[in-house]
Amino acid sequence: LPVKILDYDHIEFYVGNAKQSALYYQAAFGYEWIAYRGPETGCRDKVSYVLRQGKITLVLTAALSPEHEIARHVHLHGDGVKVLALWVDDAEKAFQTAIERGAEAAMKPVTLEDEHGTVKMAAIKTYGETWHTFVERSDYDGPFLPGFEARRSAYPAKPVGLKFVDHCVGNVELGAMNKWVKFYQDVMGFKLLITFDDKDISTEYTALMSKVVSNGNGYVKFPINEPAQGKKKSQIEEYLDFYRSAGVQHIAVATDDIIRTV
């Protein structure tokens, strides 16, 4: 049986400078600043800016000390995606089911509370250093999560027509694609949607293999790529070398008018 996932909840990036990243996503992509956590809200060791456009929620998080785990992550990988958070009915059940089926725990279930209600969260590990956090928020009406305060952009956001997250692509090592596809099938109950081989996706110089897995309602889609032989280094191999591990290659977002958006 699949782990019941309703949709994406948010995507969290670990970055070197959260404020500058937030300004970039607001200015270039028209995201709206909706929430904040940092020293001003009582969080001493890290700072997070929460941005939204349509149904897409991005969290940009930076460390405030060089010893912090987030600083280590940024030092090794550069800016990148740490958490692909999934919106669920029952975070504890989703977590327990995943663990029983062989997933590795990243964060045991916690309940966060403030004047807006409660949110339950738990997380498992996937490829590279990436996490999936299960977020149960049916009893919450705050701006984002307990611990965050509502914020507004200093200047009005100019949305560019981004509507929702279509898919999130993972790049994994040669020979690891089937292992991670099996992980999503066995642990999360995802279905294999489509397979691309190097004949489908290649240029004269670079090639890749890809399999796409999807949850029950089709809202959450994860293509998993691995390198394939080409005349030159595969773009997937190139990513693995630069990022120093498997990780999220790109996030695809939907728009009704791609020319206007671009």
List each model region and its residues.
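Internal, well-ordered alpha/beta segment that forms a basic, Gly-enriched binding/recognition surface
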Residues: 113-156
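Short helix/loop capping segments that flank catalytic or ligand/cofactor-binding pockets
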Residues: 23, 95-96, 132-135, 142-144, ...
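Short, structured patches in soluble enzyme cores that scaffold and shape functional sites
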Residues: 136, 169-174, 196, 226
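N-terminal beta-strand motif that seeds the catalytic metal site of vicinal oxygen chelate
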Residues: 1-19, 81-84, 141-181, 191, ...
